[in-house]
């Protein structure tokens, strides 16, 4: 798609493996996509979100939401990303949640980011958006490259204008992204 992407994970072993070309999951076509984009300098891996926040406008968060004891989604990883984001942003950035989360999660994410900014005594503008995945296991690469739909939920006009950028290749082919 021509974008520079930095993938962040707290698992150092996983990141070391990815930096050495070891893909921790099997998904048809994924190894080739990763290899090609690493070779072309567009794909990077790190354990530190802070390594990439200075030069980005959009951060996509795709973390696990395992079921909690009562069967609801456990949002601890989603909220930990929000905490790290709030502790480290320096300029306007949009945090986009890709994970499957319940209605109202964006408000919780915003509250966590605001708390972290208040602790820092900072007034950095930000937005939170939702962009759920519609990828089938075994067909994720194909589904990503040829989506039947892309849905993005935003609250601000600023985020609405910014978020089509990552989807520009789809928009060029008359693919509609509803906001």
PLM region descriptions:
Residues 1-179:
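Structural/interface elements that position substrates and couple domains in central-metabolism enzymes
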């Amino acid at each position: 798609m021509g974008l520079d992407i930095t993938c962040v994970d707290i698992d150092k072993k996983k990141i070391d493996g990815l930096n050495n070309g070891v893909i921790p999951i099997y998904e048809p076509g994924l190894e080739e996509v990763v290899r090609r984009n690493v070779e072309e300098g567009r794909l990077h891996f790190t354990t530190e979100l802070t390594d990439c926040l200075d030069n980005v406008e959009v951060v996509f968060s795709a973390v696990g939401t395992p079921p909690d004891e009562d069967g609801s989604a456990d949002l601890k990883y989603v909220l930990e990303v929000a905490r790290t984001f709030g502790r480290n942003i320096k300029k306007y950035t949009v945090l986009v949640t890709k994970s499957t989360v319940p209605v109202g999660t964006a408000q919780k994410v915003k509250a966590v980011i605001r708390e972290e900014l208040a602790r820092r005594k900072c007034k950095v503008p930000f937005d939170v958006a939702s962009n759920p995945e519609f990828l089938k296991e075994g067909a994720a690469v194909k589904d990503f490259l040829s989506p039947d739909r892309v849905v993005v939920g935003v609250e601000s006009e600023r985020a609405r204008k910014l978020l089509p950028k990552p989807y520009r290749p789809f928009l060029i082919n008359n693919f509609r992204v509803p906001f």
